[in-house]
Design a protein with these regions (language model features):
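Short, Lys/Arg-enriched N-terminal segments with co-localized hydrophobic residues
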Residues: 1-10
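Active-site beta->alpha loop and helix N-cap motifs at the rims of alpha/beta catalytic domains
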Residues: 13-152
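Residue-level recognition of short, well-ordered coil/turn positions
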Residues: 33, 51, 112, 167, ...
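A general structural signal for well-ordered alpha-helical segments in protein cores
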Residues: 39, 75, 100, 132, ...
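Structured C-terminal cap/extension of enzyme domains
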Residues: 47, 207-313
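Short secondary-structure transition/capping segments
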Residues: 66-69, 126-131, 156-158, 211, ...
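Short helix-capping segments at alpha-helix termini
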Residues: 80-86, 110-111, 139-141, 164-168, ...
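Catalytic alpha/beta core domains of metabolic enzymes, predominantly
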Residues: 149-257
Length: 313
């Protein structure tokens, strides 16, 4: 066991995880089955486009639509494709605490570099805290606390209690809204005892989050390489230039949906399928949506170093 800032920490092949961790959308074929080739392509895209880590499946990956067997099976798919190039964080959120623990155990058995979970819906903070204790009973590596509205959110002092109690809790994804203020709250309590506080919200508030103590963010992966550029420029000290790039990207983040994510990944030659597991309804992209997206993509073309945007079909 390592000691991190005076705290006995967990074992992991990645000593420290921070930066931009891309969240993989789950691709489907015409029959609604997980499309392995596209999932592999998305994982490889994250590796090749300079992202700092991979997370699957969380909200972006529609964990709530995935069966237990296919979720565990495709953790193996993602890890096989990544091949140790980046840390892979396994999303363990579920419909019950027992299911979360099942996924945490699968992460241990299959060698996930970290696991992340938020409490099941319609539970409370005490159940959430017990859930992380039970995860630590079956998983030896670093655990990420995902603190989100509507999923038994924890107060800053409760997050600090978990950090004190559980050696494996080395990371926090703080996304109670307003995110930057809550990141500042958690940073003031545990910033010297965790390795990274991640933000969320698709990177919408990335500069403000970094300014308040975050060392990373977990956005959907389809444009996360641009967020990597923002992150790197910010860490290099040119904060105004980082904000300029962020202002160019922000209109695209603001219209992000699951159909949008799949569409961008297809435009970048990553996904072959735009299929949804459930009907997208009003979120389905129409011709006007695609024209607007194309206009907004032109603004960030020079910020994209690989996987350029292909023409709309």
């Amino acid at each position: 066991m390592r000691h991190v800032n005076g705290k006995e920490g967990s074992m992991s092949r990645f000593n420290e995880m921070k930066g931009i961790f891309g969240l993989l959308p789950t691709p489907y074929d015409a029959d609604g089955e997980v499309l392995e080739r596209d999932l592999r392509a998305a994982a490889d895209f994250c590796c090749q486009s300079g992202q700092h880590g991979i997370v699957w499946p969380v909200m972006v990956g529609e964990f709530y639509f995935l069966g237990e067997d296919e979720r565990i099976r495709h953790l193996e798919t993602v890890m096989d494709e990544v091949g140790g190039r980046l840390p892979v964080v396994f999303g363990c959120s579920g419909v019950s605490v027992s299911q979360v623990v099942l996924f945490a155990r699968a992460g241990q058995e299959r060698g996930a570099d970290s696991i992340i979970a938020m409490a099941p819906a319609r539970t409370d903070a005490s159940i959430a805290m017990d859930m992380y204790r039970r995860m630590a009973d079956v998983y030896d590596g670093p655990i990420m606390v995902q603190n989100a509205d509507m999923y038994a959110p924890l107060r800053g002092e409760q997050v600090a209690q978990l950090v004190d109690e559980i050696p494996q809790v080395e990371y926090v994804k703080e996304e109670r809204q307003p995110g930057p203020k809550h990141i500042a709250e958690v940073h003031s309590m545990v910033g010297d005892r965790v390795k990274c506080i991640f933000g969320g919200a698709g990177g919408k508030f990335l500069p403000d989050e970094l300014n308040r103590g975050a060392l990373g963010c977990m956005p959907a992966c389809e444009l996360a390489d641009v967020l990597v550029k923002i992150y790197d420029v910010w860490q290099g000290g040119d904060r105004e230039r980082a904000r300029e790039i962020h202002r160019r990207l922000l209109p695209l983040i603001n219209i992000e949906t699951h159909p949008f994510m799949r569409y961008i990944l297809k435009r970048r030659g990553v996904f072959t399928s735009l299929e949804e597991r459930t009907p997208p309804g009003a979120l389905a992209l129409d011709e006007a949506d695609r024209r607007e997206i194309s206009t907004l993509l032109e603004v960030i073309e020079d910020d994209v170093m690989s996987f350029p945007f292909e023409g709309d079909e």
